[in-house]
Amino acid sequence: MKIVKTSLIAACLGAFALCGAEPYLHFPLNEGDVSKIKEATGKVAKVTVWNSKQFDVVDGPDGKAFNFNTPDQCKTYAGVSFNMPPAFDPTKGFTFTALVKMPENMHRSRQYQLFFWSNSHQQGPGIRIYVSWKSFYVLLGDGSKKPLLLTSKNSQGTLKDNTFYRLAASYDGETLKIYIDGVLRGTAKGVMKKSTRKWAAIGASSQSGSAYGFNGIISDVKIFDKALSDTEIAEMKPEK
């Protein structure tokens, strides 16, 4: 058991040892082969790859990365789903972070789904993280018609086409914060409830049908079971 636990910790820590924070879950998404995604993360959570033919292997920030190829008007979605450990409780605090490269000719009004663990797209309960109108959005729902929605929608928070960003969101049970390349871009106070959905997904909210998918690169996804500090998140910004 000690050997297994040690290997899991090493796999999860990865490049994060510098700031000392240990991810609860880590999806490198730099394996260069879709079939190896499960090998890299399967010991931590049961992983399923959605529509594997819609993944393109491209050069990424750390080895080969995956381009989630879900063009406009597409009805099947490239994604990576996994069973969220029952003990994980985002209402007590969490941080989500990922290296993201938006596509060329980003459609302004389209919703590019980064992370989905929610009972619904609009009210929750749960977490929904996406890009739309060239801005970073985080929605925390409690099941009511007034979810906590925070966006970077201003001149400084605009995301450019074909550009890598380190996007991050943290919540301490009261305050939600969003960051772009380590810089705080918005705060809001509110409450959320934990989703009752057993699985969460990266890159899409469903395999097919009426859903939202990502088009571009998602890499180095880390989920923490606490709200990281501004300093810890600033240390994560990608090298330009």
Model-derived features with residue positions:
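Extracytoplasmic low-complexity segments
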Residues: 18-74, 85-86, 233-240
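Short, aromatic/His-centered strand-loop micro-motif at the edge of beta-sheets
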Residues: 139-166
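Glycan-recognition/cleft segments
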Residues: 112-140
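Short surface loop/edge beta-strand patches of beta-sandwich-type extracellular domains
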Residues: 69-94, 118, 150-158
